[in-house]
A protein has these predicted regions:
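Conserved active-site alpha-helix within GNAT-family acetyltransferase domains
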Residues: 97-125
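A generic "binding-loop/recognition-motif" signal
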Residues: 10, 54, 98-99
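Conserved acetyl-CoA-binding loop-helix of GNAT-fold acetyltransferases
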Residues: 63, 69-82, 94
């Protein structure tokens, strides 16, 4: 699967897909975010990283509706994790209300939100966009 960094002008397509999947899209243009387009013959979906340093948020993972159910989500996340490692990321953090079991199967473990690094805990994902009931998972 190929990953390409999105240009700011391409964020509208990502926002549309996130909105269609009932996922947060309000902060896509804020600083400190990298979003990628993933393709395997054609567009599969999107995903992103937020923050700087060794701890970052894995976020905005969305697979196009007509590409779901073919194992592409697993490949997309693995490819995004490699993009993170290439940027010096040691630990990925995420919040989810619907896909905790999917991420657990990929090696993410449940964690206490209160133990999140300050930079992660201060993100809009943590403070405003995701509900307190969202599962918090981490992968080192």
């Amino acid at each position: 699967m190929a990953a390409a960094l999105l240009d700011p002008g391409e964020l509208a397509g990502l926002a549309w897909c996130l909105d269609a999947a009932n996922l947060p899209s309000a902060d896509l243009a804020d600083p400190g975010r990298l979003f990628f387009r993933f393709e395997a013959d054609s567009l599969v979906g999107y995903g992103g990283l937020e923050g700087e340093g060794a701890d970052r948020l894995l976020r905005s993972i969305v697979i196009l509706a007509d590409r779901r159910g073919h194992g592409l989500g697993r490949t997309l996340v693995t490819t995004l994790e490699q993009q993170a490692r290439n940027r010096g990321v040691e630990r990925l953090h995420l919040l989810t209300t619907t896909a905790a079991s999917f991420f657990r199967a990929l090696g993410y473990t449940d964690a206490d939100r209160g133990a999140a690094p300050q930079a992660v805990a201060a993100s809009r994902e943590f403070t405003a966009l995701c509900p307190a009931s969202a599962a918090y998972l981490v992968k080192a």
